[in-house]
Amino acid sequence: MKLRNIIISLSIFLLTGCLCGCTDWLDYKPKDKQSEEQQFSTKDGFYAAVNGIYNRMAGNSLYGKYLSYEMIDVLAQRYTVNLTGDDSYSKYLQALINWDYSNETVLSALSSIWGEGYSTIMNTNVILNNLEKDMNGEGAGVLPEREYKMLKGEMLAARAMIHFDLLRLFGPVYFRNPEGRGIPYNESTETKILDILPTETVLKDYIIRDLKAAEALLLESDPVLTEGPRAEYDQITMDNSMRYRQLRLNYYATVLLTARTYLWGGDMDNALAEARKLTDDPKVRGFFPAVDSGTLLGNSVNPDLMFSTECLFGYYNKDRGLIYDYTFGGSNTGNKLLVPRAGYVDGQLFANNPGDYRYQSQWENGSTLDGNSSKRLVKFREITDTAKDEMSGSTSDENQILQVQKFHGTFCSLMKLSEAYYIAAEATATEGSEVYDMTAAWNYLQQIFDSRGAVRSSNNFRDLLTKEYIREFIGEGQVFFYFKRLNKAFDNAYNGRQAIQIEIIPGLPFYDDKENVTEEAKEKRFIAPLPTNELDNR
């Protein structure tokens, strides 16, 4: 989809009680200013438009599938797939796991990511434009200044986040070619051709600029700073515009996203500075407490498999259990099944760590497509309603507990507090940086080990950090980008596909007939092609 052909279309999420409890949509395609002005003539109209952005981000083309648990994790060699299946979906998975970006279904999925990404970005620009009008007297003037700042901060962060992930997917390995072809950065509400900018320009001049502006606005306005995420329904006022902050790009999520972007650009000093805003503030851990092992492991009815108390940002999916059923296990034993190879999870990923809470709660016995014993991921499993039935007629305090239980059963994580500790650890472990301090690096990593019931199983820092990214973020979209950032090999210890260093398998698109694959050849795994129609007529 060409940027110039994207029609401004605000997908309005209808507000009924809970912020994200409804799935009805109103598609709005203004052909004149009157309908746009009507949309933004009330405070509810602004919130409906903003909720529409988050709902689009949670769609399959972005973070609800391709950029979380499916395409991006298959590219990251997390699973085995049916290598002999002849149906279109099997061929799609075969192409992904071999980094074959020429497959028609893969190209279609990439085009969907690109098109939906830029369409959503344009809609954030429409909202940002109307926020300015509302504040400077050109609009209806319906928003208090605090809410103007909060919504503007969220939309700047959303615009930056989507651009950043498009850059990470379609751009080069940054440290190898920062001046390489990047992507357009769209700040306009008009349909026009935008220049494709160098990667470094997109990252430093636009993405980080927007994130720092968002941080400043949210620091002055976000209730998460004083009241935490407030993941419960307000039964008194029925106004949830300031609640469920984990479903919004709140201040803390924006800080983590900024740290993530600095790390991508190799700026360890600033990455550490941003990460420490989260790791060094005791209030943050109070608002986003580590999962309680007793509650997690002792609860067979409705455990918090997503570790939602620690999540800074994610999305709502009332049908989360279907992801598990159709993709990771449940009733699925067919070609769509994604499970790691036999022996990988317990024999390598969690080797010497059988007490790790993630191993004990997020994985269960299953089998590969060829019938060998394996482990299957259950973090997306449906949470039963037994506890809800037992609480009928309960007191208001119990009702609040009930709301939290319902929340963690429908929540899917995109950002966890633990990532701030990993970023701080990597920054301080980088030789040559001004913040190099291996004692500090190990301390940051140890804090996560302690919160997971894990032990430090070796003195190889990079090996343990790599395994931590896989253990922590499988199904959440970060593992592929971790390997891309480092141009790192998927050797035996890090791939769930097969017990071999993947890079030396003959027949893969980048294989160069050498035992040791070149860095240039390895880089090809990680760079998705821009849609053909985006490059036409430029």
Give names to the regions the model predicted.
Residues 1-31:
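Bacterial Sec-dependent N-terminal signal peptides
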Residues 21-76, 275, 317, 442, ...:
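Membrane-proximal, proline-rich intrinsically disordered regions
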Residues 37, 67-76, 81, 172-179, ...:
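Short, surface-exposed recognition loops and adjoining beta-strand edges that mediate ligand/DNA contacts
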Residues 90-170, 197-202, 216-218, 404-412, ...:
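Conserved, well-structured interaction surfaces
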Residues 108, 277-434, 487-538:
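Elongated scaffold/linker segments in the mid-to-C-terminal portions of large proteins
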Residues 123, 210, 217, 274-277, ...:
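Alpha-helical solenoid repeat scaffolds, predominantly canonical TPR units
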